[in-house]
Amino acid sequence: MQKMVWAFIVASAVGLLIGPWLIPYLRRLKFGQSIREEGPKGHQRKAGTPTMGGLLFLIAVPMAVLVTVGFTPQSGVLLLGLLGFGLIGFLDDYIKVVKKRNLGLRAWQKFTGQLILSLILIYGVVYGIDRGTSLYLPGFEVWWDAGALYYPLALLLIVGTTNAVNLADGLDGLAAGMTFWVALAFAAIASAGTSDVTAAFAAALAGGCIGFLFFNHHPARMFMGDTGSLALGGAVATLALLTRTELILPVLGAVFVAETLSVILQVASFKLTGKRIFRMSPLHHHFELGGWPETTVVYTFWAASLISAFLGVLLAMPIRF
């Protein structure tokens, strides 16, 4: 518990300390956010806000983890999930901002990178720390050895989670605030399961979100970019693997799931019927275009994330790992 608390404090403090330096540094490099014309009109005023602020997570979280629990097989895998996906996001942001290629990495390039990194993570979790291929079935309180089926399921979970967090990063403070509650839930789950290293990492991730939110709450002074959203998604997915909560993650991150489903349903509906279900997807834009102030949407989604994270913790309590 003590390591977990210190990891949270260190990550928060580091984030708060480097934020005032990072923002002007990104401005000097002219790493400003470009806003899509087809997005909500009110977002155009955000153009030029420094992006790639997710670098804060890539500094604060590893520092907190290494200071509190050091480098172990578990912390190594968790840091790989954070830093590896953060690197993919950084390359995507760099191409968008510096190379002026609006879409960043091509879809096949991003997917290939995510696929390779996911396979490395799965191998590290299953064999490197001997996690095995068993899955906990919530509600039934039984374990099922998925065998070879575990690998595609884990692959879907990692890639899906990283992109779900990326989709949710559309309003000031939204993705970081939602991830904060999920990370805090993982800290509680890991602590109850007597995994100090995993609990410390989850607490550091939550602390990093708090440090970042100080500069990202409305009106945001910097955005995390894909650097941050993919890093957060990769970290959350890896936490699910290590805590054996793969099948509970959709509950823990239910709002992220809703954001993703809104995009899938919107695209499918438009292709099949020519009509849209939502005013705009992801879901947060639907409410925004319905007249909700941005802060109201964000606070509502934060509250929903808190509730879903709490329910996820209750489902995970029988697990001991």
Swiss-Prot record:
Q: Name one GO biological process term.
A: cell division
Can you cite an annotated GO cellular component?
plasma membrane
Per the record, the domain of life is: Bacteria
Q: In which pathway does it act?
A: Cell wall biogenesis; peptidoglycan biosynthesis
What topology does the record note for this protein and the membrane?
Multi-pass membrane protein
Q: Name one GO molecular function term.
A: UDP-N-acetylmuramoyl-L-alanyl-D-glutamyl-meso-2,6-diaminopimelyl-D-alanyl-D-alanine:undecaprenyl-phosphate transferase activity
Q: Where are the transmembrane segments?
A: 4-24, 51-71, 75-95, 109-129, 139-159, 173-193, 195-215, 222-242, 247-267, 297-317
Record PROSITE patterns: MRAY_1, MRAY_2
Which reaction is the catalytic activity of this chain?
UDP-N-acetyl-alpha-D-muramoyl-L-alanyl-gamma-D-glutamyl-meso-2,6-diaminopimeloyl-D-alanyl-D-alanine + di-trans,octa-cis-undecaprenyl phosphate = di-trans,octa-cis-undecaprenyl diphospho-N-acetyl-alpha-D-muramoyl-L-alanyl-D-glutamyl-meso-2,6-diaminopimeloyl-D-alanyl-D-alanine + UMP
Task: Name the keywords, alphabetized.
Answer: Cell cycle, Cell division, Cell membrane, Cell shape, Cell wall biogenesis/degradation, Magnesium, Membrane, Metal-binding, Peptidoglycan synthesis, Transferase, Transmembrane, Transmembrane helix
Which EC numbers characterise this protein's activity in its record?
2.7.8.13
Subcellular localization(s) per the UniProt record? Cell membrane
User: What cofactor does its activity depend on?
Assistant: Mg(2+)
**Which purpose does this protein serve, as stated in its record?**
Catalyzes the initial step of the lipid cycle reactions in the biosynthesis of the cell wall peptidoglycan: transfers peptidoglycan precursor phospho-MurNAc-pentapeptide from UDP-MurNAc-pentapeptide onto the lipid carrier undecaprenyl phosphate, yielding undecaprenyl-pyrophosphoryl-MurNAc-pentapeptide, known as lipid I.
What family is this protein classified in?
A: Belongs to the glycosyltransferase 4 family. MraY subfamily.
Q: What is the name of the protein in this document?
A: Phospho-N-acetylmuramoyl-pentapeptide-transferase
Question: What is the species of this protein?
Answer: Heliobacterium modesticaldum (strain ATCC 51547 / Ice1)
